[in-house]
């Protein structure tokens, strides 16, 4: 059994652990920003293919104490890197730390790179080339106050890069964060879902994949395919089983709206290119005028955060109108708003039944749940 660490957006660790259990991972242990787990290589392959919330899966190589940079070099140079990947593979080293007393993480990165290359020279007579932008193999170094852990990345490009969304507007949500938010809403396939501010359609694309039981990694490749122990036949079987499980792309009760015609066109293009054209209804509409087509359902939206000059005032004027529209049209619906603007509930004039801290990268946000029961949410 190997040990791994699955990284995810902070606040979604509980949901990631549930996904890991579903693909057969064991010895689950959550921490800030991820989940430690154990499993064989088939579990690692399935995790990369199936997990909707993970950012990447790191394979644990070694952990050891350190006091200075040379301790880290000695730990790294003792590892049998040539057994893990070929010298022809390009290499990158990535270092992150919490409470690390060392002055320069860049120097740590350099020393680990030296250690890996020195080990290759000793064992193979040559060293791998360094590629910082799009490497074949990445060694990840994590430093705590007095311990160093070395990992090999099994994912490659971040797992939120599904290979689906092409057109985007402004700064779209990462797909794994959108998937995690959908999980937090409690939405189930078959239940009506509306995104009234759909942007380039990230929530819609993730919801369709969930509804069709489509593994999010089917349209991409992974770094584990470039490791020396890659079991191609086993991976082919896992991938084929996931493909066979997909449901046919038939119309779903999932709807997207946006006031911006450019966003509507981007969403339609992304759905079409993903093979989901006709599965989701997308129209240009103002949320303030939009009305649901069913008595119950889930609304999920990512309103603007108001980070640019003047937008704060615009949002302060918009939110009371949003509150009025929700009270008028959306009774019976559970409405979820993901935002970094913590003024939203007060200005909307509706009391959230739940507010969950989440992070969009480094930006602290909230997922506000507002249950629209007619006449019961008004603030006095």
Language-model-derived ranges and their functions:
Residues 98-101, 157-158, 304-308:
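A short, flexible beta-alpha/helix-coil linker loop
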Residues 286-289, 293-380:
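C-terminal catalytic and target-recognition region of SAM-dependent MTase-like enzymes
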Residues 150-184:
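SAM-dependent Rossmann-like transferase core, predominantly class I methyltransferases
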Residues 8, 258, 339:
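Short beta-strand/turn micro-motifs composed of small residues
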Residues 173-291, 308, 312-316:
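Conserved S-adenosyl-L-methionine
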Residues 46, 51, 157-162, 166-167, ...:
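Flexible, glycine-/basic-rich loop-and-beta segments that form/coincide
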Residues 1-137, 380:
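Non-catalytic nucleic-acid substrate-recognition regions in nucleic-acid-modifying enzymes
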């Amino acid at each position: 059994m190997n040990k791994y660490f699955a990284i995810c957006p902070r606040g979604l660790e509980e949901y990631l652990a549930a996904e890991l259990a579903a693909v057969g991972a064991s010895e689950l242990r959550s921490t800030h920003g991820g989940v430690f787990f154990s499993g064989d290589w088939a579990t690692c392959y399935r995790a990369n293919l199936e997990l909707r919330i993970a950012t990447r899966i790191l394979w644990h190589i070694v952990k050891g104490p350190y006091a200075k940079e040379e301790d880290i070099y000695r730990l790294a140079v003792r590892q049998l890197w040539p057994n893990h990947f070929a010298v022809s593979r390009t290499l990158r080293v990535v270092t992150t730390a919490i409470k690390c007393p060392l002055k320069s993480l860049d120097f740590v990165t350099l020393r680990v790179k030296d250690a890996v290359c020195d080990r290759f020279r000793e064992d193979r007579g040559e060293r791998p080339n360094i590629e910082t932008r799009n490497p074949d193999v990445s060694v990840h170094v994590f430093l705590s106050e007095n311990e160093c852990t070395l990992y090999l990345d099994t994912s490659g490009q971040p797992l939120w890069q599904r290979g689906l969304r092409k057109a985007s507007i402004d700064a779209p949500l990462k797909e794994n964060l959108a998937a995690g938010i959908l999980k937090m809403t409690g939405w189930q396939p078959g239940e009506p879902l509306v995104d009234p501010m759909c942007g380039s359609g990230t929530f819609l694309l993730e919801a369709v994949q969930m509804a069709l039981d489509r593994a999010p990694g089917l349209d991409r490749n992974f770094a584990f395919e470039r490791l020396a122990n890659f079991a191609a036949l086993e991976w082919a079987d896992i991938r084929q089983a996931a493909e066979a499980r997909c449901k046919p792309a038939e119309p779903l009760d999932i709807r997207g709206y946006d006031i911006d015609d450019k966003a509507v066109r981007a969403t339609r293009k992304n759905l079409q290119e993903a093979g989901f054209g006709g599965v989701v209804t997308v129209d240009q509409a103002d949320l303030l005028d939009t009305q649901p087509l069913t008595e119950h359902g889930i609304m999920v939206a990512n309103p603007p955060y108001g980070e640019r000059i003047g937008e704060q005032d615009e949002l302060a004027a918009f939110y009371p109108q949003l509150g009025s529209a929700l009270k008028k049209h959306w009774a019976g619906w559970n409405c979820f708003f993901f935002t970094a603007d913590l003024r939203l509930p007060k200005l909307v004039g509706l009391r959230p039944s739940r507010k969950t801290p989440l992070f969009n990268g480094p930006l602290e946000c909230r997922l506000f749940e507002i249950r629209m029961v007619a006449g019961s949410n008004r603030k006095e």
